[in-house]
Amino acid sequence: MNSPRFDTVSFLTDYGTADEFVGVVKSVIRDLAPHVGVIDLTHEIAPFDVRAGSLALARCIGYVAGGVVLAVVDPGVGTSRRAIAIEVAGGAGVVMGPDNGLLAPAVAMAGGAERAFELTNPEYQLQAAGATFAGRDIFAPAAAHICNGVDLAELGPEVDPILLLPGTIPLPREDGDALVTEVLWVDRFGNCQLNVGPDDLLPTWGASLQLQIGRPSDPNGVTVRRAVRATSFAELSGGAVGLVLDSYGMLAISLDQRSAAEELGIGAGDQIVLVGLDDVQGVATAVTLSRR
């Protein structure tokens, strides 16, 4: 008889909550491991968007309780892609999901993979008529059994962590006196998180920056706006666009009590070029540059 190992599963998916998928997965876990509580991180990742799921999981990983982290954004469900469980943090946690890059950034932030196993043992799975609901049939039972104290080695063959698929988080790059960045995430308030932190900004830059939004090849060309570096939304009075240090230590394009994404036409994946400006007063009007 195994002794319980964990009492928490933190759960992230693209399932949404309109259908029964989330509830069924949680019910399977509760049935097999009644002592376990399931914490919903989010189930509103855009369908099939592995990158968005990996970024959300990376934002969460430093704050989740010790235990199992179950993430499912799985457009390749039912194919030869592997279902995996990865031990991290000296055994204090297990990160579980499809081997499609979803888990890689979070695993790296947790200190890297210590052991990894493919979930293939049918003794720890549910019998199913089809292969399209791995969350219910493979991941939920595995999460419950791990919480009950079953060693990962019982769930399937060990996998060399170096063979796991990497994530696809873009890096900023310098282009002369400019910094080419990308929008990683737009939150529900319309703040647009960039893939840069304050230390990535050029040391010669002051408090004012130029934002070049989009690419010349885009249908609407490039929109140019002035932004000011700020520590709170309240500093962005008079309609100023801000570059605010967000709660994850990244810089975000923001407005005060308005959606920067809507007003500036910005979405996840958009290119934003940052250019340093002389610190002058005033708020610039929008300028659009397009290819003739």
PLM-predicted stretches and their roles:
Residues L126-W205:
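Anionic-ligand-binding alpha/beta catalytic cores of soluble enzymes and soluble regulatory domains
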Residues T8, L32-V38, A52, Y63-G66, ...:
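Active-site histidine-anchored catalytic micro-motif
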Residues N2-T13, D19-V73:
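Alpha/propeptide regions of enzymes that mature by internal proteolysis
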Residues V25-R30, E87, G112, P198-L202, ...:
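Short, solvent-exposed amphipathic alpha-helical segments in soluble enzyme
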